[in-house]
């Protein structure tokens, strides 16, 4: 954890770096953290998105479900064009677009 943040990380996470309780040391911990989200639905979607935006290093997603029309209004990673696709596949693709540095 001795590596310093690179220029891109400093720019991306600048608002977190100024927080007293996070700073560079905390951000490095976030970047090296691993999370498993079981269920990419009404709670899993926003949790995954916020964790990726915060800079979590690795996120695992588990959900055997497909996207239905009834999911669209409450599961922010999915749109109408995603109906009948795997929740995990679509969520992983969208999360990579948000932060390509996070391993999904």
Per-region residue spans from a language model:
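Adenine nucleotide-associated cytosolic modules
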Residues: 1-104
């Amino acid at each position: 954890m001795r590596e310093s943040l690179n220029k891109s990380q400093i720019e991306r996470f600048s608002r977190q770096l100024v927080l007293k309780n996070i700073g560079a040391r905390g951000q490095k911990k976030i970047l090296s953290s691993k999370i498993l989200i079981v269920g990419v639905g009404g709670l899993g979607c926003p949790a995954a998105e916020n964790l990726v935006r915060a800079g979590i290093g690795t996120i695992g997603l588990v959900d055997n479900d497909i996207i239905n029309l009834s999911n669209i209004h409450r599961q922010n990673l999915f749109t109408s064009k995603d109906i009948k696709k795997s929740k995990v596949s679509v969520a992983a693709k969208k999360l990579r677009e948000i932060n390509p540095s996070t391993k999904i």
